[in-house]
Amino acid sequence: MIAALFCTPGLARSANIVIWPVPTSSLPSHIPADSAALNPALPGAAPALPTHIGKYRVLGKLGEGATSDVFLCHDDFHGRDVAVKRVRPNPGGDASEARYSERFFAAEAALVGRLQHPNVVQIFDAVADPVAPYIVMEHVAGNTLRPYCRADQLLSLELIVEIGFKCAMALGYVFRQGLIHRDVKPANLLAVLTHGAITDVKITDFGSVLNLESEVTQVYRVGSLAYMSPEQLDGAALDCRSDMYGLGAVLYHLIAGRPPFDAQVQAAMVHQVYNAQPASLCGMRSGLSPAVDAVIQRALAKNPGDRFDNWDQFAQALSDLILQRQVPRGQLQGVLDSERFNLLRSLDFFTSFGDVELWEVVHRAKWQRFNFGHALYRKGDEGRTFHIIAQGALEVFRDGQKVAQLGAGTSVGEMAYLAPNPELRRHSADVIVSQPATTISFTPDTLTQLAPGCRHLFDEAFIRVLVRRLHAAHEALAHPRRIL
């Protein structure tokens, strides 16, 4: 039973709401908005920026919400820009609101250094300042997805599906850490911009997170009405499928230019969430297939049991839309990150790599396409680049005689990479492309750019390769006729 819904009348479709079983005054959102600073110290004058927030040098203001301000700062110790979200001092304010703000801060502060995923904003630091506590986060060059929900700024279908895939993988990672975000919405998804184009997405703002492993009393029934699942609105027990509903609602909004449920009156909005079915997306966008609509509608099912069973299943359904050409290819004519990720997952070399490490390889590796007959290596050449075959095949020739054929998932050139001196780095055979091949490659310099955990997995993979080759060499010596 809902005791109270707190949001601005007439703004039900976009309002951030907090639901408690006790009466209180209207609680403002704790989520920083995309708006410019609107808190002047004097009429018509913006407040002066602080020079520092703790040890962080203030460079400018990124935005503000009802209870907090977000500043662009520089961390001189680590030599990086950061985003600092500082709770705005509110002396004499409502005590109950202050307590809830403290809990939101504590929920996010508990995640310092815990979430390490390329599509999740990192939380570097949290300082419980008695006047104005603040959270220090990774600074993302871009903006939220809110502008792309407008009918005149809609993204291409392929990009929306790609964003959905990355968010599903990231939220799956978050859930494996024992966390449910509970406020998945466009304003909490940051679009990473490179030369004005969206190249990645990151999930942010974990103030509403539900920690399934925490014994500390947590605030329940929080979220944004347009993206809240029925069970979250009920205050019922939640699992990953509640955030799944939220992501489905975000994707629906990005595709249609309006959320799945839309009402000016809050009570009508709640009724729709409980009882109405989202309108079909078919016909709302040119080129949108029934398969796309089916995936989104399943994520938005009223009953959690009718949604996808887990995040991997949801992510796979989104990926299949691209692989099966259910989404028209527009501006992203190249290979998408989701396609590369799934390709790596299928390769034997990467069997021990987790999702986080695979994403790192997707972004750090050099991806190359080679035509039939191309010489990847020539005997006598020196080099330390190693390749892992993602697609296609290579043939190895020694003194003009074919001695091996290498297929997908096989590494080549790792001996020269691992060799301790230049003489041993000379290739002992010709390696020629026998079927058009896609490879990913690293050098010692590019491999050092990977996180230590990812480099360790490469070392383990190299050891497995060397053990297999030593075993094959032993078999060749023991049974020469069998090998020949």
Regions found by a protein language model. Give the residues of each.
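Conserved N-lobe ATP-binding subsite of Hanks-type protein kinase domains
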Residues: 69
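AlphaC helix of the eukaryotic protein kinase fold
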Residues: 88-114
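Activation-segment/catalytic-loop signature of the eukaryotic protein kinase fold
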Residues: 126
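Conserved short submotifs of the Hanks-type protein kinase catalytic core
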Residues: 130-144
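Activation segment signature within eukaryotic-like protein kinase domains
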Residues: 163-164
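Protein kinase catalytic-loop region centered on the HRD/HxD motif
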Residues: 168-179
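Cyclic nucleotide-binding regulatory domains
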Residues: 374-436, 447, 463
